[in-house]
Amino acid sequence: MITTRDIAERLGVSVSTVGRALADDPRISEETKFRVRQAASDMGYVGNRAARMMRGASSNVVALVIPDIRNSFYSTIAHELSKNMEAEGFQLMLSETDDDRTAELRHLRELSANRVAGVIIVPTARPHSESVKLLRALPHLQLLRRHPSLGSQWFGVDDHEALRRATAHLVAQGHTRIAYLGGPEELPTGAERLRGFRSALREGGLPDDAGRTALGPPSSMEHGRETVRRLLQGPDTPTALVLGSIQLTLGVLEELSGQGVKVPEELSVVGFGDEPGFSWWGPGLTTTGLPIQEMATGCALWMMRRLKTKPSNDGPYTSVSPGSLVLRGSTAPPAGGKARSGAA
């Protein structure tokens, strides 16, 4: 088995330099890190922990790389994936990036060194080129977010249609001042959800300035709280909100409850995702329901099939879940207004 001493002898550097370079120590120059990693890859070096994993049998570990396990959306996916993979003799390993592409790269380096069987990833907005190369060398698929450089295997939600449907419901109720709180456009999911929001406004014959947008970290409850606080204090207060992530929804609901805002009498709200508490929050939250369990199960089955059949190359595969609008009591025509004819 190749050791750090072998790499050091090949490159003419010390063993400690090799170890620090592989650990991404900031004291080592980028040029030296590159030379060490390249030599390690060429020589088939496996790190100490990976070596322990690899003694005996080949890896049966599949990695799930996500932004934040505290987001119940991702924790539910992790649970369903783990359950399905365990039934097939595989184990799920979890890595969190906090939507930081450097953290993403660090995890992918480790996963590659550990020779995991495959990777399921919710990619950051702009993965490093090295991350792309590492993933291309592993069986992988993208989940929810889709980055063109990472291949064409993807499981996700029709984000455009989900937000178009949610916004169209508010337009049909007669709202003309609608605010959208969602993730940044640099994220594929954020861009598609914003596009769906704007599509519904256009289809409803509303002018561009009928919709206000507040884009920010999709996993930040604080962003939801601060944004809705600002919207309610400013001029031309919206009569309706449509939300583009679960964490933003949680933050908004917390702020509305704290301020005593009457929903839907003073403000209509359409959330995102369908957490257990959403059905009994206030009048019951109208929200975009997502088939998380079904999507995770399909994702696990695809990966298991891919690992067991080991095709010579992966053809494109896309699975799009439509989502649904769950109607409850948090939406109504604006005060002094009325729903359009045929509104749900």
Spans of features found by a protein language model:
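N-terminal helix-turn-helix DNA-binding module of bacterial transcription factors
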Residues: 1-60, 338-344
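Alpha-helical recognition/docking segments in bacterial nutrient-uptake
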Residues: 2, 60-168, 172, 233, ...
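Short acidic/polar active-site loop segments enriched in Thr and Asp
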Residues: 14, 60, 117, 175-178, ...
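Hinge/beta->alpha junction and helix N-cap segments in small-molecule ligand-binding domains
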Residues: 49, 67-76, 94-103, 145, ...
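Short acidic capping loops at alpha-helix termini that bridge into adjacent secondary structure
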Residues: 176-177, 208-212, 262-269
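Flexible loop/turn connectors
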Residues: 229-344
